[in-house]
């Protein structure tokens, strides 16, 4: 079965960053892999031995009649600012186009508890997206934007590398499975249907601490 798309979770490697806001994409990708296991499309390691990425293939029942399609799920291990190199390597290996890439990433311009789905567009200051755009030579990949909120009067670079606060954790736990539902909806029903599903989700976040 040929891989039909590459799903990329953005984040930084290593336990130090595992629970940080910048690793929201990794969190959702992990949940997608668990969903695949539950549905009978267990992930299998691929592209083994590489130092720039981790990758698995998995199957999801998103075709008519509940038939399975195969996807590659990729975590860049290059650190955020060089994510595009890993995505380019996976794209070349599977001989797919930039339009076959689906990226999961944290989004400062949305509050925690909200998501948006789109194809193409700018990078909104996100260095991972900037790197992917540069390496692929095209912005026409799909992005699932996972809101983390923008802090007032604080350094953004430090904020994204902090772990979610304890009072934010219940919201994160709601967002992650809803994001997986959105991914499934995209591959099952297309962009517009998935946009409505993702855009209609709203988990109320706690207020941001004042500086």
UniProtKB/Swiss-Prot annotation:
Annotated residues for binding of tRNA: 17, 79, 81, 127
GO molecular function: peptidyl-tRNA hydrolase activity; tRNA binding
Family classification: Belongs to the PTH family.
Subcellular localization, as worded in the UniProt entry: Cytoplasm
Catalytic function, reaction form: an N-acyl-L-alpha-aminoacyl-tRNA + H2O = an N-acyl-L-amino acid + a tRNA + H(+)
BP terms from Gene Ontology: protein quality control for misfolded or incompletely synthesized proteins; rescue of stalled ribosome
Site for Stabilizes the basic form of H active site to accept a proton, residues: 106
EC primary class: hydrolase
EC number from the UniProt entry: 3.1.1.29
Record site feature (Discriminates between blocked and unblocked aminoacyl-tRNA), residues: 12
Keywords for the protein's UniProt record, in alphabetical order: Cytoplasm, Hydrolase, RNA-binding, tRNA-binding
Recorded superkingdom: Bacteria
Cellular-component GO terms for this entry: cytoplasm
Complex formation: Monomer.
InterPro entries per the UniProt record, alphabetical: Pept_tRNA_hydro (IPR001328), Pept_tRNA_hydro_CS (IPR018171), Pept_tRNA_hydro_sf (IPR036416)
Protein name, per record: Peptidyl-tRNA hydrolase
UniProt-listed PROSITE patterns: PEPT_TRNA_HYDROL_1, PEPT_TRNA_HYDROL_2
Repeat among keywords: no
NCBIfam families in the cross-refs: pth (TIGR00447)
UniProt-annotated catalytic positions: 22
Entry function: Hydrolyzes ribosome-free peptidyl-tRNAs (with 1 or more amino acids incorporated), which drop off the ribosome during protein synthesis, or as a result of ribosome stalling.
């Amino acid at each position: 079965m040929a891989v039909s798309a590459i799903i990329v979770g953005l984040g930084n490697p290593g336990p130090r960053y595992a629970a940080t806001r910048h690793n929201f994409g990794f969190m959702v990708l992990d949940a997608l892999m668990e969903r695949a296991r539950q549905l009978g499309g267990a992930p299998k390691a691929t592209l083994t031995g590489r130092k720039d990425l981790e990758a698995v293939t998995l199957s999801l029942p998103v075709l008519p009649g509940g038939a399975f399609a195969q996807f590659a799920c990729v975590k860049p291990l290059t650190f955020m600012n060089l994510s595009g190199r890993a995505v380019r390597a996976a794209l070349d290996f599977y001989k797919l186009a930039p339009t076959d890439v689906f990226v999961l990433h944290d989004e400062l311009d949305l509050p925690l508890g909200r998501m948006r789905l789109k194809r193409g567009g700018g990078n909104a200051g996100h260095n991972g997206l900037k790197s992917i755009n540069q390496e692929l030579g095209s912005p026409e990949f799909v992005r699932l934007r996972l809101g983390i909120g923008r802090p007032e009067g604080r350094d953004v670079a430090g904020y994204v590398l902090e772990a979610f606060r304890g009072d934010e954790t219940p919201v994160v736990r709601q967002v992650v499975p809803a994001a997986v539902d959105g991914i499934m909806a995209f591959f099952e029903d297309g962009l517009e249907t998935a946009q409505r599903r993702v855009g209609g989700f709203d988990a109320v976040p706690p207020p941001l601490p004042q500086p």
